[in-house]
């Protein structure tokens, strides 16, 4: 190949010229895409790159007499060591100009990182070079990569064994590097706490810190944050913030339940991988599910105490980002559906911060994870049942008792039907208190309400819990749950719903409103209706909406007297899955048959059209032939006349 041009130089000086000379020539000839340097410049961080002179690799490529050593000149040992050192820092392979600049910057960043420069010569003298350094990577004329060994002059297609071993070593070294920065660890935690509201993105934050973290390349930063979020960052940060509560506003990765009451500060043990990325919202400002400063009103603290009694149980279930239910009594009922929601954290007093869950993108990202958790943890509890419990819990008394039942039993062990019947009894007793029965479901019954717990700016003590249940338009409650309308319908099983609805109606007088409610529970896909419920967060007029949406099933009092659900029970509540599957299959088959039939007709039409076109072409050809023959007849006639005249 091209190797013969440099062969004489290489013979005289075995090791050095082969290194300093032949490969730069080769790299000039083909801009070699050498061994990917992302691993290399991570690897350099492990070596103490304390070389006082910057690695001028571009010089070695030039033809200056100091660097292009000829055969006759001897080499001073210092130069030899220097090129060895530069070579070793490169990882021996990156010679293309793009990677030169890449390595150059990485080396400069790691230069300040060294403990003492005297380590380096000893290292190079211990291991003069790696056997993997002899290999370099090139592109053949056909465009494939091949690997060339400059010592044995062997070229091969597959990646050499030495390179694979070295990559393995570098990976192990990187793992050690990632876990061996205690100073950086503490510093990053403090920086992230201090700049929680100043809008740094996490990468920028770590880059600007003046400690050793500034020396890490970006990809290692992302790795450390990913590794260490699980290992140390969360527990440490929590203990830190609990010991000095007023010092920092709030840390971007910790999601505290806003409980000023006595909640045990047990750290998170599990946390999803994608959560650190989401901890910055559109402004990069602060945490994802930041909750309001809790009201110090008495009812709120009651519910908090109940939460803290059962707070230890859900910790074992928590798999995803715990978007905790706000403790100010806004929707405490959304704590039981998410078993991840009640994870207790150290009580952190929070400065009043505007709600940040209004970003629909974040909600859209969070929703699948939370739904998956709900299905994992509460596989035995249907979402529709939780809905019905929330729908039935109308008044303050029934709400309090049901929350207490939920929280004492724990999310795995509640008996839904008994709860519903009790709630229905309570609601019939408290029915004269003129509260709209559907108003509670405006925010709590929607199965998505735990994705966006309605976030309020801090409320004064004067707001009791009862108005929050009937949700009058309190001025300080922004509507946050509106972006959720885009989500699809949540699966409900239509089988168990009518039974629970019947239990309700066994205890209640049969009124159009209760029928409405049961019909809303029976509707198999509560897509738009439920979301319209949840979107009217600050609205007390939910019942008129529902009546307009489901006006089909309202009975006049005269008819209601003659109406008995027992007579139609046998046609209610059949499992619709089978019928739905059949219907969808038949619809698809009909659609396919129709498309096949239409395509056949289309091909026939095209065929006929082409036949017509062929006929037209043939007709024009015949016309042309007729015209041509007529022309020839005329000419022959003329010639005949001339001949007869000549004769």
Curated annotation (Swiss-Prot):
Q: Which UniProt keywords apply?
A: Acetylation, Chromatin regulator, Coiled coil, Nucleus, Phosphoprotein, Transcription, Transcription regulation
Compositionally skewed regions (Low complexity) per UniProt: 103-122, 252-267, 286-297, 332-345, 511-541
Localization terms from the record:
Nucleus speckle; Nucleus
What does the record list as GO biological process? chromatin remodeling; DNA damage response; mitotic G1 DNA damage checkpoint signaling; negative regulation of proteasomal ubiquitin-dependent protein catabolic process; positive regulation of DNA-templated transcription; positive regulation of macroautophagy; positive regulation of TORC1 signaling; regulation of autophagy
Q: What does this protein do?
A: Acts as a linker between gene transcription and histone H2B monoubiquitination at 'Lys-120' (H2BK120ub1). Interacts with the RNA polymerase II transcriptional machinery via its WW domain and with RNF20-RNF40 via its coiled coil region, thereby linking and regulating H2BK120ub1 and gene transcription. Regulates the cell-cycle checkpoint activation in response to DNA damage. Positive regulator of amino acid starvation-induced autophagy. Also acts as a negative regulator of basal autophagy.
Which chain positions lie within coiled-coil regions? 618-644
Q: How does it assemble?
A: Interacts (via coiled coil domain) with RNF20, RNF40 and UBE2A. Interacts (via WW domain) with RNA polymerase II. Interacts with MTOR and other components of the MTOR pathway including RPTOR, RUVBL1, RUVBL2, TTI1 and TTI2.
Q: Please tell me one Gene Ontology term that the record gives under cellular component.
A: nucleoplasm
N6-acetyllysine: residues bearing it: 302
Residue ranges, compositional bias (Basic residues): 76-86
Protein name as catalogued: WW domain-containing adapter protein with coiled-coil
Where are stretches of biased composition, namely Polar residues? 23-37, 211-225, 317-331, 428-463, 489-503
What post-translational modification information does the record give?
A: Phosphorylated on tyrosine residues.
Q: Which stretches of sequence are listed as region Disordered?
A: 1-138, 168-353, 428-549
């Amino acid at each position: 190949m091209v190797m013969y041009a440099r062969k004489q130089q290489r013979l005289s000086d075995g090791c050095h010229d082969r290194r300093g000379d032949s490969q730069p020539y080769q790299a000039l000839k083909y801009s070699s895409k050498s061994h990917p340097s992302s691993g290399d410049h991570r690897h350099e961080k492990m070596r103490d790159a304390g070389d006082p002179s910057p690695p001028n690799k571009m010089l070695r490529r030039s033809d200056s007499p100091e660097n292009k050593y000829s055969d006759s000149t001897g080499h001073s040992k210092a130069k030899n060591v220097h090129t060895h050192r530069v070579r070793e820092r490169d990882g021996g392979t990156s010679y293309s100009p793009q990677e030169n600049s890449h390595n150059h910057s990485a080396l400069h960043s790691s230069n300040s990182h060294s403990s003492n420069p005297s380590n380096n010569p000893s290292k190079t003298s211990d291991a003069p070079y790696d056997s993997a350094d002899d290999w370099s990577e090139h592109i053949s004329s056909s465009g494939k990569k091949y690997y060339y060994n400059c010592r044995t002059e062997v070229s091969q297609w597959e990646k050499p064994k030495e390179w694979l071993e070295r990559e393995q070593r570098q990976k192990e070294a990187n793992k050690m590097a990632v876990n061996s920065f205690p100073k950086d660890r503490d510093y990053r935690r403090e920086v992230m706490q201090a700049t929680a509201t100043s809008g740094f993105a996490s990468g920028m934050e770590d880059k600007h810190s003046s400690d050793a973290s500034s020396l890490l390349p970006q990809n290692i930063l992302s790795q450390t944050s990913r590794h260490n979020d699980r290992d140390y960052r969360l527990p440490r940060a929590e203990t830190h913030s609990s010991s000095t509560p007023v010092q920092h506003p709030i840390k971007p990765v910790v999601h505290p339940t806003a409980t000023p009451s006595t909640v045990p500060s047990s750290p998170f043990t599990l946390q999803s991988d994608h959560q650190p990325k989401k901890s910055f919202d559109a402004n990069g400002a602060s945490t994802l599910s930041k909750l309001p400063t809790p009201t110090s009103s008495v009812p709120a603290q009651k519910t908090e105490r109940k939460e803290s009694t059962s707070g230890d149980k859900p910790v074992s279930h928590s798999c995803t980002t715990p978007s905790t239910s706000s403790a100010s009594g806004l929707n405490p009922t959304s704590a039981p559906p998410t078993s991840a929601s009640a994870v207790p954290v150290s009580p952190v007093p929070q400065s009043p911060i505007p709600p940040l869950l209004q970003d629909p993108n974040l909600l859209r990202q969070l929703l699948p994870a939370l739904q998956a958790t709900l299905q994992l943890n509460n596989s035995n509890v249907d979402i529709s049942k939780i809905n019905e419990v929330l729908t039935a819990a109308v008044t303050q008394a029934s709400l309090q008792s049901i929350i207490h039942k939920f929280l004492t039993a724990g999310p795995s062990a509640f008996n839904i039907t008994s709860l519903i019947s009790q709630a229905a009894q309570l609601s019939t007793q408290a029915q004269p208190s003129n509260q709209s029965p559907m108003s509670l479901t405006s925010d709590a019954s929607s199965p998505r309400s735990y994705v966006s717990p309605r976030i309020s700016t801090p409320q004064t003590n004067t707001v009791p819990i009862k108005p929050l249940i009937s949700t009058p338009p309190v001025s300080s409650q922004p509507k946050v749950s509106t972006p959720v309308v885009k989500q699809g319908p949540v699966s409900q099983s239509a089988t168990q719903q009518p039974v629970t609805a019947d239990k309700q109606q066994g205890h209640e007088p049969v009124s159009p409103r209760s029928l409405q409610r049961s019909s809303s529970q029976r509707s198999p896909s509560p897509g738009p209706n439920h979301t319209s419920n949840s979107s009217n967060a600050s609205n007390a007029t939910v019942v008129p909406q529902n009546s307009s949406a489901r006006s089909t099933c309202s009975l006049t009092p005269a008819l209601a007297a003659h109406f008995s659900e027992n007579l139609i029970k046998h046609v209610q509540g059949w499992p619709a899955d089978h019928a739905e599957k059949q219907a969808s299959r038949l619809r698809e088959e009909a659609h396919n048959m129709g498309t096949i039939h239409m395509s056949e007709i289309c091909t026939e039409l095209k065929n006929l059209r082409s036949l017509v076109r062929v006929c037209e072409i043939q007709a024009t050809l015949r016309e042309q032939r007729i015209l041509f023959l007529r022309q020839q007849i005329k000419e022959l006639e003329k010639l005949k006349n001339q001949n007869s005249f000549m004769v």
